[in-house]
Design a protein with these regions (language model features):
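Acidic, low-complexity, intrinsically disordered peripheral segments
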Residues: 2-8, 12-13, 18-33, 42-63, ...
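Bacterial Sec-pathway N-terminal export signals of envelope proteins
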Residues: 45-137, 143, 292, 299-333, ...
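Small/polar-residue-enriched beta-strand and adjacent coil segments characteristic
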Residues: 92, 131-203, 311-314, 318, ...
Length: 511
């Protein structure tokens, strides 16, 4: 028995009930993916003091039946590698993930942010490390004594002295011996660097989720083309049969008109399905960085396999210890704590050491060793309220970081529970949709038999065809939702990059 498939985007143009159901399913899927990606991107940008592009732009816009990447999101773009070829490039699920991790703009920008954070740490560390310079000068000067205030005329003493040669060379050292302000700045910058490293890993997880969703949706749209093609073929056979009966005087003209309308409706759906597939492939190509104009085909399908998932408590425990955005937020709190200590340390004294050693004289051949060394104790007395203002700002930043961490912890709980609910619901819907397909196909066969036997007109056949289309569309929708829920659960638990590949191999996320 041939199974006819239709994607949710094509089913919306079918019966009203199927359209509403599919719209709700894709709408809910879009909300979850958008929330997961936006939460990840905002976690990367939270409290970051390093320079570089912000990744907190919303990744998905709108809550529609079709999940669309926002053009403003860096995760919707990539840096294409290579040049397009005439050959059709086979792209597997794993290959798409690997390409996205290499070429996606979001992960590349976050990698640059990590380098920027590393540079900021070195800048802060330089305040505690010795600053050593060397210089050599040779000059000649002539001095007017009157310019110096010696306006008296003494016998035998010239009014102008010189030219006098001056030579000096030496090594100069400056060293901060004690500065709690600088020490805590270094500690804060180190925490920021670790946060940037975790944010980079979180960006990779976001890319996996975005790529996985785009790949799965492309599979659904490809199945939609097959569905629409099969529906056109079925409608064509019905029209041919009805038209032959009309010509033979067996069926009325209205039956032929009804069959013709059904055929043209299915043809319109096929045109729309092909267009949707072509556009979705462009979206996928942009995310993973394929060369512009490169033809490719998907080599993996989306089979259904029940997922062996862990309990909610175990999943939450793993998420709190594994999610890179949560670990980054913890480092942001630590950085804010050190920043506050650094601001308070502006009240404390500092000790600096400076010295130099070298040669000085009238020229290189007539010079002698000279040196100078000294220590400076700086004690702040009153700085016009600057330190108080710095402490207030640092304290406010610390409170914000802690609040954002608490909010993210609650969001992780929601993400994990939502993903598990979606996974369970989608699995149940897949089973129901399978049964609906069998029943709809049986109904279509019986309607065709009744029509061929002349018991009824072709209205029953047309209605049965719509039921088959809706049933297969529901199956595709639930299958897409189930596989997306797997990817979303891996993301919610904090190991999307490893978890997606794992579920593809074993359908077990509990390992």
């Amino acid at each position: 028995m041939n199974q006819i498939f239709l994607t949710p985007s094509q089913a919306k143009r079918g019966t009203l009930s199927g359209m509403k159901e599919l719209r709700i399913r894709r709408w809910l899927g879009g909300i979850f993916v958008a929330a997961a990606l936006v939460a990840g991107a905002q976690g990367q940008g939270t409290g970051t003091t390093t320079s570089g592009p912000s990744l907190s732009t919303p990744l998905y816009s709108g809550a529609s039946s079709s999940i669309m990447l926002s053009p403003q999101s860096p995760y919707s773009g990539s840096v294409p590698q290579g040049k397009a070829t005439a050959d059709v490039l086979p792209v597997s699920f794993k290959d798409a993930i690997d390409r996205g991790l290499r070429n996606n703009l979001g992960v590349l920008l976050q990698s640059d942010n990590e380098i920027s954070a590393r540079g900021q740490r070195w800048k802060e560390l330089s305040e505690l490390l010795p600053n050593v310079t060397t210089s050599t000068t040779q000059s000649a000067e002539q001095i007017d004594l009157a310019e110096l205030g010696l306006r008296f005329n003494f016998p035998g003493v010239p009014r102008v002295v010189g030219p006098i040669g001056v030579f000096q060379t030496g090594v100069y050292l400056q060293q901060t011996v004690l500065s709690l302000n600088s020490i805590n700045k270094v500690r804060s910058a180190s925490a920021q660097q670790r946060a940037a490293r975790f944010s980079y890993q979180d960006a990779r997880d976001v890319v996996v989720l975005a790529t996985g969703n785009a790949y799965l949706e492309t599979i659904a749209d490809a199945a939609g083309v097959d569905t629409a093609t099969a529906q056109v073929a079925t409608a064509q056979r019905l029209f041919d049969k009805t038209d032959d009966q009309r010509k033979a005087g067996i069926s009325p003209a209205i039956d032929a008109l009804r069959a013709k309308v059904e055929l043209q409706t299915r043809q319109q759906q096929l045109i729309a399905a092909k267009n949707d597939l072509a556009k979705q492939k462009l979206v996928l190509a942009r995310i993973i960085g394929l060369p512009p104009g490169q033809l490719f085909e998907l080599t993996d399908k989306a089979p259904y396999a029940p997922l062996t998932a862990m309990s909610v408590d175990e999943a939450l425990k793993r998420a709190y210890t594994s999610r890179a955005d949560y670990l980054a937020a913890e480092q942001q709190v630590l950085a804010a704590e050190f920043t506050k200590k650094s601001a308070a340390a502006e009240y404390y004294p500092t000790i600096d050491l400076a010295g130099d050693y070298g040669d000085a004289g009238v020229n290189v051949g007539n010079s002698h060793g000279v040196f100078q060394v000294g220590a400076t104790l700086n004690i702040p007395i009153f700085q016009g309220g600057k330190v108080h203002g710095d402490v207030l700002q640092a304290d406010a930043t610390l409170k914000q970081s802690r609040q954002q961490l608490d909010s993210l912890r609650a969001q992780i709980d929601s993400d994990v529970r939502t993903a598990m609910l979606d996974l369970q619901s989608a699995a149940e819907q897949v089973e129901v949709a399978r049964s609906s397909i069998d029943l709809a196909n049986q109904t279509l066969e019986q309607a065709q038999d009744r029509f061929n036997a002349g018991v009824t007109d072709n209205l029953e056949v047309v209605q049965a065809q719509e039921s088959v289309a809706t049933a297969n569309a529901n199956y595709i929708s639930s299958l897409y939702a189930h596989n997306l829920a797997k990817v979303s659960l891996a993301r919610a638990m904090g190991f999307a990059e490893e978890g997606v590949k794992l579920y593809l191999e074993s359908n077990d996320l509990s390992k």
